[in-house]
A protein has these predicted regions:
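Active-site mouth of glycoside hydrolases
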Residues: 21-292, 302-365
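Extracellular low-complexity, O-glycosylation-prone Ser/Thr/Pro/Gly-rich "stalks"
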Residues: 368-384
Length: 384
């Protein structure tokens, strides 16, 4: 999802503890997490790595763990061309001096260190996207401002790709020994309009293989929205390949360990009930290809009168299907510093709505039995 730029926050550095972790294993189409093959729930906290108060990070991560959630998705990117347009940033692509540097200051990579350390402390695992399709916190366009590419040409631009791989190498090597890593993610919602779908598929194939060469122990995911390709035009936008993504082709990439799906029916021109079909369509592909599939973003705006009912219906469909885990967009809490990095989709910890939609669902999905058929595939699906 696109997000709004962060607000004014306090700065304080923290170091991440480095601990070994065994190679991850899956029972397809589910994950092995905490040493057990199971279904579970997670959330999104894109802002966790951009908080400048350790107390804020600690409270949020503690409450996520207290909710019974296993995974949260945190932005591992923060690019800038000026060094002054973001209160926290990790990478400075200076278009004036023509230099690319990592921000090692207290408002730099130390903030991602703090998020990883808090996740380790509370037993939460992290999905870490390392690039944004959108302009929030930098994104692809900061690379293109530096190298003179376009959004469409970025995916095949040799110099831009080398710079991104250098950043990926830095992030993966920094955290690959952490027990908090669930998945390295190539990009948040990659799109390439007016491109053949093979452009993103080739990019994802090459980059995921590169990451596996750096760290064969951990999962790698694409971070796409799950766009499907169909000749049936009556199915509409989500099945039209118009964003340059072919979910099914990408699911076949051997160095991607699972598929990702996002879901915002109203914004895409559908109704809320349509979301149930979107879930089922992707769950069927999990069985077809023997790979876990994650509904890693879904939400309903707080102004929607029947929000709880809509979310609960989707969650029941998730439980009734073969979606490995789901992560609602997004977790909200009243942070000690007063920071408010949320949008209208946030579900706030401590409210009745949060109990009904988040905690109750986490408990329900954790009780779902892994099928005997899935268990028989135990040794065949593990990160490459």
């Amino acid at each position: 999802m696109r997000v709004s730029p962060l607000l004014s926050l306090f700065a304080l550095a923290a170091a991440s503890a480095a601990k070994g972790r065994p190679k991850q294993r899956e029972v397809s189409p589910v994950f092995n997490i905490d040493g057990k093959n199971q279904y579970f729930a997670g959330t999104n906290t894109w802002w966790m790595s951009h908080l400048t108060s350790d107390a804020d990070v600690e409270q949020a991560m503690s409450q996520i763990a207290d909710s019974g959630l296993k995974v949260t998705r945190v932005w591992a990117f923060g690019n800038t061309n000026t060094g002054a347009d973001q209160p926290v940033y990790f990478q400075f692509l200076d278009t004036t001096k023509k230099t690319i540097t990592i921000n090692n200051g207290t408002n730099g990579i130390a903030r991602l260190d703090a998020a990883v350390a808090a996740a380790e402390k509370h037993g939460i695992q992290l999905v870490l996207p390392m690039l944004n399709n959108w302009d929030d916190l930098g994104g692809i366009n900061t690379y293109c401002a530096y190298f003179g590419c376009t959004h469409e040409s970025f995916w095949t631009h040799a110099e831009a790709q080398k710079a991104y791989r250098d950043y990926v190498t830095f992030i993966v090597n920094r955290y690959k020994d952490s027990p908090a890593i669930f998945s390295w993610q190539l990009c948040n919602e990659p799109r390439c309009q007016n491109c053949e779908t093979s452009v993103i598929t080739s990019w994802a194939t090459e980059l995921s293989s590169f990451i596996k060469s750096l760290d064969p122990k951990h999962r790698v995911s694409l971070g796409d929205e799950g766009w499907l390709c169909s000749d049936d035009t009556s199915l509409g936008y989500a099945y039209s390949c118009s964003e340059g993504i072919d979910f099914e082709a990408n699911l076949k990439i051997s160095t991607l360990d699972y598929g990702t799906v996002h879901m915002y029916p109203i914004g895409w021109g559908y109704t809320y009930p349509w979301g149930n079909q979107w879930i089922r369509d992707h769950a069927a592909l999990a069985l077809k290809y023997g790979k876990p599939i994650v509904l890693e973003e879904y939400g309903v705006e707080s102004t929607t009168s029947n929000r709880t009912a809509v979310l609960q219906q989707w969650q029941q469909t998730i439980i009734d299907s073969d979606i490995a885990y789901d992560s609602f967009w997004q977790f909200g809490t009243n942070l000690p510093s007063g920071a408010n990095p949320y949008d209208d989709y946030a579900m706030f910890y401590g409210t009745q709505e949060y109990q009904d939609v988040v905690i109750d669902h986490a408990q329900a999905i954790s009780k779902k039995a892994v099928s005997t058929a899935a268990r028989r595939r135990a040794s065949s699906r593990r990160p490459n």
